[in-house]
């Protein structure tokens, strides 16, 4: 490991899979068959390597099925908004305006820190940017623009320690 200073370890990916034994209720059905634990994080530290947890925030096609209140909706329906047609493999996303979705990501960040991760690398901290977004319903925005909402979330996540955003 000579010359290696950081190791990025996937904790949650853009497919919604969790790579450790999370205690967060919304994560229970999405835990990967391959996981790591706090001992693995400790081994990195003992080797002089800073562990960095990689967590994909709102691009998550699985968690909406666990808690529908966390999802972006299609127009004024209870259906999920999908990032493509269903027959073309379209997937739902978590809604950044949803307090449930925000709490879910916050809980995963807190768990990563509790496992010993010193830094968090966040990906997918965004609203969907693809065609068809005009049909997306984000619900109550609290009067915040999309940019303001993401900034608000990041401020909270960064208050607990180093968070980097891709």
PLM regions: where:
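N-terminal structural segment of carbohydrate-active enzymes
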Residues: 1-9, 49, 99-102
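Substrate-binding cleft and catalytic face of glycoside hydrolase catalytic domains
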Residues: 14, 43-67
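Catalytic domains of carbohydrate-active enzymes, especially glycoside hydrolases
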Residues: 2-17, 111-123
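Glycine-rich, proline-tolerant flexible connector loops at the mouths of alpha/beta enzymes
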Residues: 11-31, 124-144
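Aromatic-lined carbohydrate-recognition surfaces of secreted/lumenal glycan-active proteins
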Residues: 50-60, 120-125, 142-166
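Aromatic- and glycine-enriched glycan-recognition loops and surfaces
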Residues: 1, 27-50, 146-152
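The substrate-binding groove and active-site-proximal loops of carbohydrate-active enzymes
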Residues: 22-34, 88-103, 140-145
